[in-house]
Amino acid sequence: MGISTFFGLNVGMSALDMAQQAEAVISNNISNSNTPGYVQESAVLQEADPYPPLPSTNAPIMGGQLGQGVQVAQVQRLTSSFLNKQDRTNQSTSNKYDTLAQNLTQIEQIVNEPSSQSLQNALDNFFGSWQTLSTSPSSIPARQAVIAEGQTLGQTFQMVTTQLEDMQSNLTGTVQNQLQELNQYAQQVATLNKQIISINNMNQSGQPLVESPNQLEDQRGHVLDEMSQLANIAYTQNSDGSISVSIGSGTSIPGNIPLVSETTFYTLNTATALPTNMSSFVSGTGNAFMARTSAPYSGTLTGGTGTSLDINLQYVSGGQIAGNVQGLDETNQVLAQMDSFLSALANQVNSIQTSGYALGSSVTSTVNFFTPTTTAANNVILQVNSALTAQDIAAATGSNLPGDNSNALLMVNNAWNGYPTTATTYNYSSLESNQSIPITSSTNATFDQMLTGYVSQLGIASAAANSNQQTADALSQQSSSLRQSVSGVDLNEQAAQMVEYQNLYSAAAKFISIVDSMLQTAINMIP
């Protein structure tokens, strides 16, 4: 079996080429060690075809095969699909509780601000002014103080309501913006899918890759990381190299919300109410709205696709969107609780006011103390009746009784023990023996207890979110470290590999030098 005179040179050259390519891969790893989404690469080495060729139809069986060197079969991404999914799931959960904890902390600061302008302080001062009036029922300054404290109480609650409405509006806008971000990411994934499919189609089965879509897959992986911070995404790998992405972990609908199907992406928007028919929220391309509602709603896409879509945000259980949606729910709940509180307070104070007698009057008062109104968002605002004067305050339960303070005491009792739904007039002696008059017929809570209860509920929810945040952050850090141990670039490891291939290159160059020397000797032997 004869071989080429330059056979050894070709083998040595293959080693030089391989070492250069491997060094280029290492250089690229080092250069991108801090690039977001970059996955460490490694040169996969493969023995070159031997000489003579392996037996086949067109190649005779010959013995004594010689190796023809080495080649780089492909540049491989070092990644783990399991660790990637685990980390993205944990990132989604972590971002949810981080966002929710921030929102609940902000609500707590608004509602339970520890200052002289807090809700509790304003409520205590209001009923404290009635206590002062009960000791001097004929005092005009004491009566004016009651009106002033009532105005302060209303202004304090209005300030809190305004801040909560601002937060409500901001969270709604944030969720809408984040959905638009999700839409943009979905479009990017669909575009990258198309490019990856195109490259994979260029590669013939069983042959070295014409081109590896490593960079595109890195970009797509980074987009998935960004999406997982916004929502709890699920994705599957398709045979052509593309991925399909959805929100939720369900395998059927309802159960998830499709975002990307190979090269097709779906657009999500928000709606304030359920649509009356499918055509009002779904187009033939599958664009769907995501409504904030507790009841699921599904239907069939127009255009004959037959695909059912659930538009309920309850399936968005992770990511910043879930944290903001739950924060919005909590804000709405606090506003509803404040509406109930202020409505009950206004009703009871007005009931006491109109069942008593104004200063020097022989008939019960017809002037309400409070005239509740609503904001543009239909939340209750507590305002003192502009027609109310100091003389109009009904501090007495009887007419023409000098120093009668029983109605003022009734108002004080309201602060600590509540009042019935039906207006009842009590005198001082009856109040002494009845210390548990409820706010309404359905509850025994006092106004003080009612407000404290709201704040306590908020505190419990905030503490739970903070606890979940700590747990989720710890799991996220752990999964991120595991993922980085596989996909991240270790500079020390790269430096060691660089020296290894440098030595290999030197050895190959030395081998070529020896072969060259042998050839020179042979040539010099020719006469």
Model feature map: region roles:
Residues 1-527:
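Structural signature of extracellular appendage/secretion-system components
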